Curated annotation (Swiss-Prot):
Purpose: Catalyzes the transfer of an acyl group from acyl-phosphate (acyl-PO(4)) to glycerol-3-phosphate (G3P) to form lysophosphatidic acid (LPA). This enzyme utilizes acyl-phosphate as fatty acyl donor, but not acyl-CoA or acyl-ACP.
Top-rank taxon: Bacteria
Residue stretches spanning the membrane: 3-23, 52-72, 80-100, 113-133, 147-167
Subunit-structure text: Probably interacts with PlsX.
Gene coding for it: plsY
Top enzyme class: transferase
Localization of this protein: Cell inner membrane
GO cellular component: plasma membrane
Family that this chain belongs to: Belongs to the PlsY family.
Entries under InterPro entries matching the protein: G3P_acylTferase_PlsY (IPR003811)
Provenance organism: Ehrlichia ruminantium (strain Gardel)
Any single GO BP term: phospholipid biosynthetic process
Keyword Transferase applies: yes
Protein name: Glycerol-3-phosphate acyltransferase
Length: 195
């Protein structure tokens, strides 16, 4: 088996680690999938424990950061880094440990961008914050910032790398389909940041 394939499989399994689910159980919240949106990501954890949501966000970002770091250690081609990030994000969205029902991939995307290009990551985070302050929708902020990151990647990176990132962005936006429908119906919940 090609060693790069081994790396991608490893990235998938690392990406599959459901930190939101694990932390919720360990801290006594219970199965986070049975509350709110049913998602295991930081936004849904936020509805139960705001400080725990921050830890979930950091760990979900860290796992993809680690995946990309592993890929770089064994291959200097930046394209491999984009693929490693993609597989980590797929793992997060469709975790083998939770019967392939996971998060939406936003935190892992941020983590991988921090490693690949911190400038794009900074733009991603900046636009997320600005959008969120304006609308209070985490879902819309995630979609907008993902598209902004895609614009930067398409501008400064190769066609192949841009295509890989476009696939990643499409997956993330697709994971937000229910949120998009709720926003169109004006039934999407806004996030209250008060601690």
């Amino acid at each position: 088996m090609d060693f790069q394939v081994v790396i991608f499989i490893l990235c998938y399994f690392i990406g599959s680690i459901p930190f939101g689910f694990i932390l919720s159980y360990v801290t006594g919240i219970g199965d986070i999938r049975k509350t709110g949106s049913g998602n295991i990501g930081a936004t849904n954890v936020f509805r139960k424990n705001k400080k725990l949501a921050l830890l979930t966000l950091l760990l979900d970002a860290l796992k993809s950061f680690i995946c990309v770091a592993i890929a770089q250690k064994y291959n200097i081609d930046n394209t491999i880094l984009f693929l490693a990030a993609l597989f980590a994000i797929i793992g997060h969205m469709f975790p083998v440990y939770l019967f392939f029902k996971g998060g939406k991939g936003v935190a892992p995307l941020l983590g991988s961008l921090i490693f690949i290009d911190y400038k794009v990551a900074l733009c991603f985070l900046t636009f997320w914050i600005i959008c969120f302050l304006l609308c209070k929708y985490a879902s819309l902020s995630s979609i907008v910032s993902t598209l902004i990151a895609l614009l930067f990647i398409c501008t400064y990176y190769t066609i192949v790398q841009s295509v890989i990132f476009a696939i990643t962005a499409l997956l993330i936006i697709t994971q937000h389909t229910d949120n998009i429908i709720r926003m169109l119906n004006k039934s999407e919940n806004k996030i209250n940041l008060k601690l």
